Regions:
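Arginine residue identity/basic-tract feature
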Residues: 17, 54, 87, 96, ...
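Periplasmic binding protein-like
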Residues: 2-55, 90-91
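Short, solvent-exposed loop/beta-turn-alpha elements that line the ligand-binding surface or hinge
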Residues: 23-28, 48-80, 109-138
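Solvent-exposed, polar/charged alpha-helical surfaces in well-ordered, non-transmembrane soluble domains
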Residues: 1-5, 22, 26, 69-76, ...
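Bilobed periplasmic-binding protein-like "clamshell/Venus-flytrap" ligand-binding domains
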Residues: 28, 32-36, 81-118
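Extracytoplasmic/periplasmic, Sec-exported soluble proteins
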Residues: 12, 16, 35, 39, ...
Length: 138
């Protein structure tokens, strides 16, 4: 499989999300698959949940054990930084650390599978998001 191509040997342990997610949020697994959509299209969203060290309301999905106070301060500053050039530089700096530390292995990109039938029409959107307003009933 894909993971073997990068030297990672795994034994699949498929679980319902009600059993899988607590393993991540409670830090009880060393390796896991997690899909993460970014509705804001902003790196801050990813950093808040997946990179920032665990606190009561931030870093809640960081199952890596990674914790860096200096980086956490930069992540928090993104929410109020209005200097676009400085904010973009902070985002680039944070991504550099994330990549250098190899916090995540982006080996799998899951997309929606589209089912079609003659009775229902829908445009397949390039953003991979079905928009109900474009549904037609034939």
């Amino acid at each position: 499989g894909m993971l073997a191509q990068v030297g990672v040997t795994v034994n699949l342990d498929a679980k319902p999300k009600a059993q899988h997610f607590p393993l991540i949020t409670d830090g009880k697994t060393d390796f896991y698959m997690l899909g993460w959509g970014v509705p804001t299209y902003d790196s801050e969203y990813i950093f808040n949940f997946l990179v920032h060290g665990r606190e009561s309301d931030i870093g809640t999905w960081n199952g890596t054990g990674f914790d860096n106070d200096e980086l956490d301060a930069k992540i928090k500053s993104l929410a109020s930084n209005t200097d676009l050039a400085a904010r973009n530089q902070d985002i680039a700096d944070i991504w550099r650390v994330v990549q250098d530390e190899t916090l995540y292995i982006p080996i799998h990109h899951q997309v929606l599978n589209w089912g079609m039938t003659d009775g229902v029409g829908i445009e397949v959107d390039p953003e991979d998001q079905p928009k109900v307003k474009y549904f037609t009933m034939n």
